[in-house]
């Protein structure tokens, strides 16, 4: 399971002209689910995402996690993160989980974020989404479990 996290001043997701998820300061989390991923992996990745200290403290040092910074999380499913790009000029998505399992683990990840008390917004699984982001920094990290 892969999370590409971006520190955001704001982020939103639009589906068919309607905003389905929107946050102010916090994290945009692009989430990719691979074959063999489990609830345990989703839980561990959630802990890492929410615990990752990439927000500045009073000394302007990256020392606070999203909760400590008072931020929110916008989680967007993105199967392209699991693409194999090692060969050729076309990505292979054979490592991706089947859609039903990917959706289940995506929803589980979101539930884990909410259970930990973080305001969590979402995109719409498998939809054609327009994602907007005002990246703060930019600060972007790739987390994988």
From Swiss-Prot:
Q: Which GO terms describe its cellular component?
A: cytoplasm
Q: Which reaction does it catalyse?
A: glycyl-tRNA(Ala) + H2O = tRNA(Ala) + glycine + H(+); a D-aminoacyl-tRNA + H2O = a tRNA + a D-alpha-amino acid + H(+)
| Intervals of motif Gly-cisPro motif, important for rejection of L-amino acids | 137-138
Signal peptide positions on this chain: none
HAMAP family, per this entry? Deacylase_Dtd
The UniProt entry, under PANTHER family, shows:
D-AMINOACYL-TRNA DEACYLASE 1, D-TYROSYL-TRNA TYR DEACYLASE
Question: For this chain's UniProt record, which GO biological process terms are given?
Answer: D-amino acid catabolic process; tRNA metabolic process
Q: What subunit structure does UniProt give? A: Homodimer.
Q: What is known of its domains?
A: A Gly-cisPro motif from one monomer fits into the active site of the other monomer to allow specific chiral rejection of L-amino acids.
Q: Does the keyword RNA-binding apply?
A: yes
Q: Name one Pfam family in it.
A: Tyr_Deacylase
According to its UniProt entry, this protein's organism is Yersinia pestis
Provide the top EC class. Answer: hydrolase
Role: An aminoacyl-tRNA editing enzyme that deacylates mischarged D-aminoacyl-tRNAs. Also deacylates mischarged glycyl-tRNA(Ala), protecting cells against glycine mischarging by AlaRS. Acts via tRNA-based rather than protein-based catalysis; rejects L-amino acids rather than detecting D-amino acids in the active site. By recycling D-aminoacyl-tRNA to D-amino acids and free tRNA molecules, this enzyme counteracts the toxicity associated with the formation of D-aminoacyl-tRNA entities in vivo and helps enforce protein L-homochirality.
Indicate where this protein resides in the cell. Answer: Cytoplasm
Query: Which family is this protein grouped under?
Result: Belongs to the DTD family.
This protein's encoding gene? dtd
Q: Does the keyword RNA-binding apply?
A: yes
- Record key words, sorted: Cytoplasm, Hydrolase, RNA-binding, tRNA-binding
| Protein known as | D-aminoacyl-tRNA deacylase
């Amino acid at each position: 399971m892969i999370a590409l996290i971006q520190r955001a001043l704001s982020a939103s997701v639009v589906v068919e002209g309607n905003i389905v998820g929107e946050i102010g300061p916090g994290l945009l989390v692009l989430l990719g689910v691979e074959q063999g991923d489990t609830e345990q992996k989703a839980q561990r990745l959630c802990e890492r995402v929410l615990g990752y200290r990439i927000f500045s403290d009073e000394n302007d040092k990256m020392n606070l996690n999203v909760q400590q910074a008072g931020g929110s999380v916008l989680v967007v499913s993105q199967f392209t993160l699991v693409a194999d790009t090692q060969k050729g000029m076309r990505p292979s998505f054979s490592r991706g989980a089947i859609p039903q399992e990917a959706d289940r683990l995506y929803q589980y990840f979101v539930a884990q974020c909410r259970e930990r008390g973080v305001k969590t917004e979402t995109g719409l699984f498998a939809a054609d989404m327009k994602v907007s982001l005002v990246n703060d920094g930019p600060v972007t990290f790739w987390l994988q479990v």
